[in-house]
């Protein structure tokens, strides 16, 4: 435990779906909870419960039946700052139980995050939470650090957004970053839709969470989609059952791999975009010809939506088909990749060489929020 150390840095990875927070130097986040803020749908139904006007994270999740749930981060980018402040407040005071004014804080951001957004993050940290120092790091770069590399291409796919980010010697190459607004939340929505075709109805925000659980427990990526569809049609070997909270048991078959197949064929949900294998290839092709070999050999997967069984083999197969025939292609899928952004942040914030990189309160007071563009890149 490093709580005795007065100035341990905090690392907070704000994902669209989950907040991962903890102390620099730890090997895993202390707190992982949903990035949701829930407000009661009806006034005063819980008599004597000391009605609150809002609930955050797990508490919102457990009371979801009587709440309307909102996600303040959409597609990796913060859209609702009031709710975001509630989430940060909950992170510091309830989850980590620290006083933010005593700890330098490392936050993460999506690649290609709008400039105004990072300024606003900086402003809230210094003015609302009075942190002594802070830094904003790009999520994909942290994932690459966590895998022990400084060069490679990261496929980071979370709940709200998917990116292909080529990184050379620790610097993201912005001209070659590919962003795809298709990630875990869209897969959950799609699974809700195709389960409806089976006659199961999932509509409310609370029921969506059940579908998300089905997705996480039962879905996988097929190595060959057409073959798998044929297998599913001819036998019931791929069927699995799932028990709903009310005891009803539902059966799911080809939905198990049709759902994540959307990552490779976005046309399934009506998106006119290339799949994640093609965006990875396009991203590499936008990079200097001299570094492509290093990128092909270091394809790092990161984020919860890369946790499907079979995804690494499928990526290997698809990229091999696109790349030059002699190219060595390697997909790295670390087992802890759900949290690799946080782990990379924990590593970075505890390096002695990083300590002069923090934006201090003094620098912020002198230069204002725009300091973040000069110090964090």
Curated annotation (Swiss-Prot):
InterPro entries with a match to the protein in the record: Actin, Actin/actin-like_CS, Actin_CS, ATPase_NBD
GO molecular function: ATP binding; hydrolase activity
Main location: cytoplasm
Subcellular location: Cytoplasm, Cytoskeleton
Top-level EC class: hydrolase
UniProt cross-references to CDD domains, sorted A to Z: ASKHA_NBD_actin (cd10224)
Annotated keywords: Acetylation, ATP-binding, Cytoplasm, Cytoskeleton, Hydrolase, Methylation, Muscle protein, Nucleotide-binding, Oxidation
Enzymatic reactions: ATP + H2O = ADP + phosphate + H(+)
Chain positions found as N-acetylaspartate: 3
Processing after translation: Oxidation of Met-46 and Met-49 by MICALs (mical1, mical2 or mical3) to form methionine sulfoxide promotes actin filament depolymerization. Mical1 and mical2 produce the (R)-S-oxide form. The (R)-S-oxide form is reverted by msrb1 and msrb2, which promote actin repolymerization.
Gene Ontology, cellular component aspect: actin cytoskeleton; cytoplasm
Enzyme Commission number: 3.6.4.-
Gene3D superfamilies named in the record: 3.30.420.40, Actin, Chain A, domain 4
Modification Methionine (R)-sulfoxide, positions: 46, 49
Propeptide: 1-2
Tissue localization of expression: Shows overlapping but distinct expression patterns with other Xenopus laevis actins. In tailbud embryos, expressed in embryonic muscle (myotomes). In tadpoles, abundant in muscle from the tadpole tail with minor expression in the heart and limb buds. In adults, expressed mainly in skeletal muscle.
Lineage top rank: taxon: Eukaryota
Chain positions found as Tele-methylhistidine: 75
Job of this protein: Actins are highly conserved proteins that are involved in various types of cell motility.
Family in the record: Belongs to the actin family.
Subunit structure comment from the entry: Polymerization of globular actin (G-actin) leads to a structural filament (F-actin) in the form of a two-stranded helix. Each actin can bind to 4 others.
Other facts noted in the record for this chain: Xenopus contains at least three sarcomeric alpha actin genes that are preferentially expressed in either heart or skeletal muscle. Due to the tetraploid nature of Xenopus laevis, each of these three alpha actin genes is present in at least two copies. The cardiac versus skeletal expression patterns of actins are probably sequence-dependent. For example, cardiac actins contain a Glu at position 3 of the mature peptide, whereas skeletal actins contain an Asp at this position.
Name of the molecule in the record: Actin, alpha skeletal muscle 2
Native species: Xenopus laevis
